[in-house]
Amino acid sequence: MSEAQNKISGSGRIGYYVAESLEPVYREIAGLLGVSLGPNLRVALDADQEASPGRQATPSQAVPQHSAEMPNREKMPNRWLLSNVDAILVEGISLTRLKELLLNYSGQKTKPLLLVCGSVSGENSGFRLKTFSFSLGSEGSRLLMEGRDYTEKGVGEPSLDLMLEEIREVLRREVRNYLELPPIPWGYAYAMTLTHDIDILSLKEMPIARTFLGYFYRSSVLNWKRWRSGKVKTAEFYRTIWEMVRTWAAKVGLGQDVWQRALPTLLDLEKRLGVRSSLYFMPFPEKPGILPEHLREAKESAPANRAAFYDVAKYQTLLAGLEDEGWEAGVHGIDAWHDVQRARAEHSRIAVLTGRDKLGVRMHWLYFQSPDSFKALEEGGFQYDATFGFNEVVGFRAGTLQPYHPLNCQTLWELPLHIQDGALMGEEHLDLNREDAFRKAQPILDFAKRFGGAVSLLWHNQSFTAPRFWGEVYERLIAQGRKDGAWIALPRDVLHWFTCRRRCRAELSTEGTHWQISCALADREIIPADPSRSAGQSIPAAQSTRLDLADLSGPSDPLAPRIPPVRIRLQIEPKRVKSISVPYEVGQGYIDFPAQTLIRLEVEGED
């Protein structure tokens, strides 16, 4: 079979040629792009330059792992590396050495596409060259590790996703039959995670101090102001007054106070809506923790009202019941953000109560200090952090809708926070009415429809009762997500899906009009979940073996929901495709498939 008859191209045959300091961020960027990062050409070329005449150099970085014809890595010439990439990302480095090798390589019919981000030196004439105005590596590092300040212009736009989309558009246009893995679960438009910080479980447990008295201030003075401005309805205004009376009675042992009923109200709402969420509980009572350095003035200790006034150990039955009924219990951290030992203690406290070791965390009051906090949380044993967002506004602190691995971590996921109730409607922040709050948050969902990813919502349990009544906006955002076709799932399930996407390798092989797409993990074959939920069509053909993505996490949990398959996107004019062996969705200039061991296509005309 000649080379013309059997062509193979991988999902994202992308090499990179960047300054050494930018290598970690480019490895993470490859995961966000949905491609498997190929050779580090800077290292490979340095090795080639140092090799003695006639001796083959050994690249120190991994090459694409999906090619069936890949030679022995220890004997792999660097020219083979160049012939097996469709594009090379370049930033912060001279093109002179790369140009020399590319020009001298006569065996390569088509020179790789050079994607130049930011400033580079050296001549680049004669190449397939696309330049971008942004420095993807340096700006990506800043966004993923430090994040933007809420006062920065444009925090309401996912700046990193916008940069990545510019690169994707060039790859789709310039690389023939380009394969990618979009951050969009099969059968859905995007993912949505619902989360709740459980700061308070009961007012009557609290001393008559700032937080307790603050409730009465909000229920009287602010309640009146919000009623006069139309932010609460008349019935809600009077209900708030009545709840104040009931709360004073509860303080002396007569009945339940309003915030004792907040969590049951929240859970009943989610049962009615058929959704589940993650609830983050304070691990220890009466510990306010310490302040981040940028907030310290006279003392190190955080304000006393940052402490919890409930002992989570007394609620073990509640936490176990939540897990049994499909919710997720996590940690609302106190000092885990700055101290590994305290991170381990806070993790252990909730792990013992839930019987689960893989836990998420969100720091109370969003205390965080990058880059040290990421590492402390990873070494503390957490699976993911959900802190990276704003108290003051809604938007994109990390510039992306996608979960990601912080650049100084190996296992920790960061699940960025995008929409918070207090930022929208809190009197100390945007102070919007409910209609304006929904409209302010809706553009974030619109970006998710455009780019995929995972929208993260935070609603405190006390927001579902008097005097706030903010549950209406929460319910509307869930309804909008469903209308959009969002997969509303627990954070751990969403991260399971993104783990599958990172590990999935897709390969296209063509033989005349017969095409095949094969899928495997980086280290073994996979099997995704049932792809029957599809908005596209299915053309009968030879039955392919299905892949079960639950295989990634060991024995299946009988209570765990089905995880949707990874989505594979092939850039091809849909009218050329005559038959497909799996369900599919048609887009403008592309076709999407659910990940399968083998996908067969009959295509009109040889490529």
Q: Regions from the language model: what does each represent?
A:
Residues L266-G274, A308-A329, H347-T354, H405-Q410, ...:
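Acidic (Asp/Glu)-rich catalytic clusters
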Residues T195, G330, R362:
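Generic enzyme active-site microenvironment
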Residues L22, Y26, D335-W413, L457, ...:
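Catalytic domains of cell-wall/extracellular-matrix polysaccharide-remodeling enzymes
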Residues R218-S220, R296-G326, L353-L359, G381-N391:
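Acidic, His- and aromatic-enriched active-site or binding-groove loops in soluble protein domains
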